[in-house]
Amino acid sequence: LAWGLCLLRLSLAQIDLNITCRYAGVFHVEKNGRYSISRTAAADLCKAFNSTLPTMAQMERALSVGFETCRYGFIEGHVVIPRIQPNAICAANHTGVYILISNTSQYDTYCFNASAPPEEDCTSVTHLPNAFDGPITITIVNRDGTRYSQKGEYRTNPEDINPSNPTDDDVSSGSSSERSTSAGYNIFHTHLPTAYPTEDQDSSRVSSNSDHTPITKDHDSSVHPSERSHTTHGSESAGHSSGSQEGGANTTSGPMRKPQIPEWLIILASLLALALILAVCIAVNSRRRCGQKKKLVINNGNGAVGDRKPSGINGEASKSQEMVHLVNKEPSETPDQYTTADETRNLQNVD
């Protein structure tokens, strides 16, 4: 139980922040290896990094210099995934800045640092410059694996500090898993100004470009991010299929939604498991003590007084013993009687 309480305190007093490289000032932040950042906490976290939530234009600029993830995160006004290469398990196989219309409230976040270099910057971040005093141990985990810890706090909303809503137990950054909902998706797709793959896409998607001259091309052909322009597509229903590309047809889907497991339930289950283990150990120990065999000591009473004490314990057992006596019955006629009878018969025969 003491170990369980210790683990509970540690889980509540420590935050791990996994961050990526900066691309045109934009970077991704993940808390404690799962979707666990609210929109208010996202703004506070970016502020602690001396940054802000990026706008759509800033996210598109980051995409153009090579920024992509497989994790939903907050930007200004949206929840998005930036994708350059299509992947059936990331952003439903779409590319561009993929917008999610969600019915849940906790994801990762993206931040924008205006003082970062205009291209890619993978310099390690060592601290939260705008964090204030607090009891929480905040650990920054950079992409190269370096870790830097400090005591402090960055959240200002009491609901973010002591959440009452459960969070999704998801996987770490860059994983193939992502969140899927029953709501529709809006797509901010990017493409070449004079070409767009109209025939290879689903019929529900609407395409447009500056020339209004769509040219059919293979879906697998690559488009350099720097040559892309911003295009808005209509809402699309979140289907559930395998995302195959056979014969030029492209069927996409969102992954299965993971069940929501609150942190307090995980901690409670750990404590109950620990208590159960302790109870089993106590029961086994008690059974061993109660199950010890008692030795039966039989004394014939010839020893000293002290030696005869055990025989008193077994007195009842000795009283229950039965003595069996064998009694030899004598025959009704003695040998002398047999001899007299024989002589009488002999005399009668002589006469």
Curated annotation (Swiss-Prot):
It is a single-pass type I membrane protein. Residues 172-182, 232-249 have a biased composition (Low complexity). Lymph nodes. Residues 1-13 form the signal peptide. CDD domains: Link_domain_CD44_like (cd03516). Glycans are attached at N18, N50, N93, N103, N113, S173, N250. Residues 143-182, 194-256, 329-351 are annotated as: Disordered. GO terms for biological process: cell adhesion; cytokine-mediated signaling pathway; inflammatory response; positive regulation of ERK1 and ERK2 cascade; regulation of lamellipodium morphogenesis; wound healing, spreading of cells. The chain crosses the membrane at residues 264-284. It holds the Pfam family Xlink. Coiled coil: none annotated. Residues 144-158, 214-230 have a biased composition (Basic and acidic residues). SMART domains: LINK. It comes from the Eukaryota. Residues 25-113 form the Link domain. Hyaluronan binds at R34, R71, Y72, Y98. The modification Phosphoserine is found at S286, S311, S320. It is found in: Cell membrane; Cell projection, Microvillus; Secreted. Residues 14-263 are extracellular. PANTHER family: CD44 ANTIGEN, HYALURONAN RECEPTOR. The lectin-like LINK domain is responsible for hyaluronan binding. This is CD44 antigen. It comes from Canis lupus familiaris.
